[in-house]
Amino acid sequence: MALTKAEIAADLSVKIGLSKREAKEFVESFFEEIKATLENGEAVKISGFGGFELKDKSERPGRNPKTGEDIPIAARRVVTFRAGQKLKELVEKNMPDTEV
């Protein structure tokens, strides 16, 4: 299951005492600010959580899986996320023991 923006807004409404409308607007504004910063070519770093960075990928050769035809994959810019150390430690600490 994935956490949605609506669920984040509902949790904020309860935990902070915002109205549902205010919480929804806050969450939307938060993500809009992240998007705008990335659109401007800047990285986003959230202390204790991680960071979003832009990486430029150069053109590379690819292959059409249906026909086997060689096709170039165009150069592009992608968004990457790197979890911060605190988040990594928290996730690792709460990972259930599994045997391989």
Swiss-Prot record:
GO terms for biological process: DNA recombination; positive regulation of metabolic process; regulation of DNA-templated transcription; regulation of translation. GO terms for cellular component: cytosol. Pfam families: Bac_DNA_binding. Keywords: DNA recombination, DNA-binding, Transcription, Transcription regulation, Translation regulation. Heterodimer of an alpha and a beta chain. This protein is one of the two subunits of integration host factor, a specific DNA-binding protein that functions in genetic recombination as well as in transcriptional and translational control. This is Integration host factor subunit alpha. The lineage of its organism: Bacteria, Pseudomonadati, Pseudomonadota, Gammaproteobacteria, Alteromonadales.
